[in-house]
Amino acid sequence: MVISSLSNSQPLNAPVSSSPITQELANNLILTTLNDLYNWARLSSLWPLLYGTSCCFIEFACLIGSRFDFDRFGLVPRSSPRQADLIITAGTVTMKMAPSLVRLYEQMPDPKYVIAMGACTITGGMFSTDSYSTVRGVDKLIPVDVYLPGCPPKPEAIIDAVIKLRKKVAQEQTAERRGIEQIHRYFTLSHRLQPVSPILTGQYLQAETRQAPPRELATGLDTLVPRSLEANYIERF
């Protein structure tokens, strides 16, 4: 009887919608104070994962020195993704490295953040036009919170990116944290590449189609003849 009394233009509420009591409780004075304290503790102890694949990582390594001293921001470099909540992708990401990067990101505990450092990480950089193995943007693999352009960015720019990330962490709310979990931030698309056996096996010197150079050439250049070619020299000469 209640449904029939409603007009057709008036939408019905979903039966599984969140309770208004829970939404009001998230805006409670005590909980908001605890939320600010929780965000302050997290933004003061960001532990980055060392992930450098190219020349941009050299600029990031300059921050470890006493001149810039990024320890004052609470940044403690970690070598394990299970102990890090920030990953700074510094350098080019290739197709072969993409599954490993996604695996490292999935192993990081929530909440976690990503800083894309350098042109090669953001758009592919100078490899984006004629490279067959470069990923055109790391945001196709993992979600990015702060983009840091440059080739390479200066250490001062990296510090500015960390400060912007700290501001973002400080403004997060408890009710919004459900929407930034790992299952809601990106969708993993499995590639369609077919793994094949490697072409360069190291046995090309023993191939039947290889023509051995004459012994006079090796003797004149004072080079040692490989043992794998000695049999061919004996047969030919």
Curated annotation (Swiss-Prot):
Q: Which UniProt keywords apply?
A: 4Fe-4S, Chloroplast, Iron, Iron-sulfur, Membrane, Metal-binding, NAD, NADP, Plastid, Plastoquinone, Quinone, Thylakoid, Translocase, Transport
**Could you say which enzyme class this protein belongs to?**
translocase
**Record InterPro entries:** NADH_UbQ_OxRdtase-like_20kDa, NADH_UQ_OxRdtase_20Kd_su
Q: Which organism is it from?
A: Nephroselmis olivacea
> What is annotated about its quaternary structure and interactions?
NDH is composed of at least 16 different subunits, 5 of which are encoded in the nucleus.
NCBIfam families the UniProt entry points to: nuoB_fam (TIGR01957), PRK06411.1 (NF005012)
Q: What is this protein called?
A: NAD(P)H-quinone oxidoreductase subunit K, chloroplastic
Q: Which reaction does it catalyse?
A: a plastoquinone + NADH + (n+1) H(+)(in) = a plastoquinol + NAD(+) + n H(+)(out); a plastoquinone + NADPH + (n+1) H(+)(in) = a plastoquinol + NADP(+) + n H(+)(out)
Topology relative to the lipid bilayer, per the entry, is: Peripheral membrane protein
Q: Which Pfam families match?
A: Oxidored_q6
GO CC annotations on file: chloroplast thylakoid membrane; respiratory chain complex I
Enzyme Commission code: 7.1.1.-
Q: Does the keyword Transferase apply?
A: no
Annotated function: NDH shuttles electrons from NAD(P)H:plastoquinone, via FMN and iron-sulfur (Fe-S) centers, to quinones in the photosynthetic chain and possibly in a chloroplast respiratory chain. The immediate electron acceptor for the enzyme in this species is believed to be plastoquinone. Couples the redox reaction to proton translocation, and thus conserves the redox energy in a proton gradient.
Task: Report the main location listed first in the record.
Answer: plastid
The top of its lineage is: Eukaryota, Viridiplantae, Chlorophyta, Nephroselmidophyceae, Nephroselmidales
| GO terms under biological process | aerobic respiration; electron transport coupled proton transport; photosynthesis, light reaction
- State its location(s): Plastid, Chloroplast thylakoid membrane
Cofactor(s) the protein requires to work = [4Fe-4S] cluster
What GO molecular function terms would the record report? 4 iron, 4 sulfur cluster binding; iron ion binding; NADH dehydrogenase (ubiquinone) activity; quinone binding
Q: What is stated as this protein's family in its record?
A: Belongs to the complex I 20 kDa subunit family.
